[in-house]
A protein has these predicted regions:
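Conserved GNAT-fold acetyl-CoA-binding loop/helix
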Residues: 40-55
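Conserved N-terminal entry element of GNAT/NAT acetyltransferase domains
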Residues: 1-26, 158
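Conserved beta-strand-loop-alpha-helix junction that forms the acyl-donor binding cleft
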Residues: 117-136, 153-154
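A short helix-loop-beta-strand connector motif used in the catalytic cores of GNAT acetyltransferases and
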Residues: 56-68
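Conserved beta-hairpin
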Residues: 65-77
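Conserved acetyl-CoA-binding loop-helix of GNAT-fold acetyltransferases
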Residues: 95-114, 133-137, 141
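Conserved acetyl-CoA binding element of GNAT-fold acetyltransferases
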Residues: 82-100, 127
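Conserved catalytic-core motifs of GNAT/GCN5-like acyltransferases
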Residues: 145-158
Length: 158
């Protein structure tokens, strides 16, 4: 994959990645819901939330930064940064190959928040659903090191 950096933009085959901040307006809410319906893997939910629940979530804007990702004029996904220096990336089907370019763009444009021992990593970490074997393989192939696997705990299970 040939990538280059040009004036703060990361490129793939000379197509610039551009980021657009997500705000709680109708077209953003609708686009995010359509993207949510296309996801094969999720961390925060098992069943698709109702549109109303989704809308309320967007209005709360719970992230440090939340952006759509565009290649030329086409939206290829979105990502968020949380205050614990974690990153969530959601690329639309057919755009997984853009992950390394997007991560490079994120690392170029953002600085991690300062480390807090036992609470916040010194650098960014990427959330990957345990069932997303393709994303895990992609991260491993690019030399990234897995840190942990997180389990849910239910009273009935313990």
């Amino acid at each position: 994959m040939e990538t280059s950096e040009d004036k703060g933009f990361c490129c793939y085959n000379y197509i610039r990645l551009k980021l657009e901040a997500i705000v709680p307006k109708d077209d953003h809410i609708n686009a995010l819901y359509e993207a949510l319906k296309l996801r094969k893997h999720a961390i925060s939910h098992i069943n698709l939330p109702s549109f109303e629940d989704h809308q309320e979530f967007i209005k709360k804007h719970p992230y440090r930064s939340w952006n759509f990702v565009f290649a030329a004029t086409e939206c290829i996904g979105n990502f968020y940064l949380q205050n614990d220096n974690s990153i969530g990336v959601h690329l639309l089907p057919g755009y997984d190959h853009m992950l390394p370019v997007l991560l490079k763009q994120i690392l170029h444009d953002y600085e991690p928040l300062p480390e807090i021992k036992s609470k916040r990593n010194a650098g960014f970490v990427l959330h990957v659903p345990v069932g997303d074997h393709e994303r895990r393989a992609q991260m491993n192939a690019n030399g990234h090191t897995p840190l942990q696997i997180t389990y849910t705990l239910e009273k009935e299970q313990v």
